Amino acid sequence: ELRSPQEARANGGYFNGPTDVAWDPDGNIFVSDGYVNSRMVKFDKHGNFLMDWGSLGSEIGQFRLPHTMVVDRAGEVYVGDRSNSRIQVFDSDGKFLRVLLMNVPYPSDYQPPFTGINAERTGRGSTQPWAMCLTESTPQELWVSDADPGRIYRMALDGTILGWLGSSGRQ
């Protein structure tokens, strides 16, 4: 249902830089309101506001840019918290479940394109999840794109890295 800005604000539907949308198995709608509000918002399948969670920060349940998300068959919500270099997993009511990290070594000849990246000191990077999708297979797998070092990660839902494709560079 389309709402006026005043109605939307009162019902949790006032966004500032939303970055992604996903649905759970029950049809509930999740929106990552990332660039300014640093929160997740949940609506029922009719667009009625149910709840929101999160705030700006780096603690569990906080976000520094919830940029991408997916919902698995069990209704768990995977939020790519890009600027905190992690994926946070929540139940469908916003209860924190676990953190997934893509902490794999960079190639020895890798040159980070930005300053301040950990790779220069440790050989491991601060990966940043940019986009995610889930397979339809059983068990489901999570595929995550990462801007630096330019990889696509294949992950089990418990966070185990199953492999990756690509490397940073230009065509």
Task: Enumerate the predicted regions with their spans.
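Eukaryotic scaffold repeat domains enriched in small/polar residues
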Residues: E1-Q171
